[in-house]
């Protein structure tokens, strides 16, 4: 049986919020079967919990924000991408502020944290959502689609009319496994344009952004001294974002996601449309791991 997973140990990290610029303390904790991923604002009294679910998404400007009343948690997508990538079903994410720390702008540091904590299988079957028919949402020329696929595949295309983008591929496709996620996707960093930074900061966004946690592009090229981690790092980061956004379904997916110029808002619209259309999906479990169409890393003890 493919079992649900949580963390073996509690683990902590510190960073800054990309948009708030605030110092944030992050604690990842094990959680019982069928808890899902639950964010906790530990700086509030009483502590406020926000389950990582599509229905709890409030803001989608520049990042995905979860809300519970007037309490929010910003920029959840990179951490959720790491949770999805390593097949973590249940965990508590405690924060000392309203935003998940940006770390280096990718999911890599969160993958390292989770692997350092160790993974533990739980005594319950892991639930997958299998896509049964096509579901699409569009906004102008932007599009996001689910189609049936025996596995989990994420295909994405961006379309930036800029020399840095025109000179390299703007499309990519990843046939998901924990290994392909860690190697091909997890280290892709968020990116932004120098020309946008002044506008963003006027609107209290990207206050913590720098070349330490993002790829910064100006009219001539990439400003980061060390360049890109992957030749297709820009579109790979969009795939990373999508994997995190899609994990707000609350379960791992069996199907293909296709995005064209999609972002956090459209990704969330697609999830909400899918959830409404009950004939477009089913929940499945696997008694025999060898018959499952998705491969996860075996749990290893924390070292």
From Swiss-Prot:
It is an enzyme of class 3 (hydrolase). Pathway: Glycolipid biosynthesis; lipid IV(A) biosynthesis; lipid IV(A) from (3R)-3-hydroxytetradecanoyl-[acyl-carrier-protein] and UDP-N-acetyl-alpha-D-glucosamine: step 2/6. Pfam families: LpxC (PF03331). GO terms for biological process: lipid A biosynthetic process. It catalyses: a UDP-3-O-[(3R)-3-hydroxyacyl]-N-acetyl-alpha-D-glucosamine + H2O = a UDP-3-O-[(3R)-3-hydroxyacyl]-alpha-D-glucosamine + acetate. Zn(2+) binds at residues 78, 237, 241. GO terms for cellular component: membrane. PANTHER family: UDP-3-O-ACYL-N-ACETYLGLUCOSAMINE DEACETYLASE 1, MITOCHONDRIAL-RELATED (PTHR33694:SF1). Catalyzes the hydrolysis of UDP-3-O-myristoyl-N-acetylglucosamine to form UDP-3-O-myristoylglucosamine and acetate, the committed step in lipid A biosynthesis. Belongs to the LpxC family. This is UDP-3-O-acyl-N-acetylglucosamine deacetylase. It comes from Pseudomonas fluorescens (strain Pf0-1). The lineage of its organism: Bacteria, Pseudomonadati, Pseudomonadota, Gammaproteobacteria, Pseudomonadales.
